[in-house]
Each structure stands twice: as C-alpha cells, then as structure tokens.
Amino acid sequence: KKRGLAEKKGGARGYKNVFGNGIVSLAMIILFHYFGCEWLIAAYLGSAAAATCDTAGGEIGRLSRSDPRLITNLKKVPAGTEGAVSSLGKGAEIAIGALLGLIAWFAGMPTETFAGMEMVAVTVFGGFMGATVDSFLGATLETTQNWFGNNMTNFLCTIAGAVFSILLYSAL
C-alpha cells in the first residue's frame, strides 16, 4: 500500500472496471466473427494490449527505485500519482505488449495474411500508445473532472489502443 501497489476498494474490481477495460476488445472480436476483416483482429489485439500494458506498466513502474515523472510536464512526482510514468513502467508495457503479440501469433489468431512480427509490432504499438493515452488522461481529465473517472480513462485507453493498432496495421 505504501508504494501505491494496492488498488482502491482493497483490490476489488467491479463491473464498471471490467466494462471499461474489456468492452472494446469484446466488440472487436464479435465484429470479426461476423465480418472477418483482419483489421478487427489488429483492433482487438491493440485494445486488449492497451488494458494489459496500462496495468502492468503502472504496477511494475511503481517498483522503480527512481521517482516517476508526470507525463504532462515531466516533473518528478510520488509513485502512484495519476499520470506518472517511469522508464521501468514503460519498458514493462513494451515487454507485455510483445508477450501478448507473441502469444497471439503462436496461438494462431485466425488470420490469413496478418501474422508474425507484424502481429507482434501492432500489438506492442497499440498497447504502448493506449497506455500512454491512459497516463495523459489520468494526469489531465481524471484528476480535474469529477465526471471523468478511472473507468472512463480505461475505456478511452482501450479505444486508443485499438485505433493505434489499426493505423499501424494499415501502414504495414
């Protein structure tokens, strides 16, 4: 708790948290089932990676021996501050994104042409960028607007992850 590792509510996660982190991924995989467009797999991977990278980056980043910096102005802030980032945390985001991309590739995600290192790169990019958007929103809107809570931040993080993954997928 002292390092900010424990979640609010004693670590319990409610349905709003699950919705905020998972609804975009669920929508992408359902849409893929019906339409079969490979870019929906990229969106799914980016969305899922964004939620996972955000959590891993935040939790692992809090273990850093150096103070994190606020994403908006790069000033040192205490661990656990909304919008704080660290090299350790950002490195964890890249590593987790790569792991998720590798798992998707080796598990044989259902695609004809989208696989291999492209799949890994799209997953890493979506996860990293989505988590970065989460940090920015945490430092700005989440801390200044009562109506804009963590679940909204998570929801927009996963949308950003999906969008950034689609953009890279389209460019490859």
Feature roles, as predicted:
Residues K1-L168:
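Interhelical loop and helix-boundary elements at the membrane-water interface
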Residues S170-L172:
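Alpha-helical transmembrane segments and their cytosolic interface
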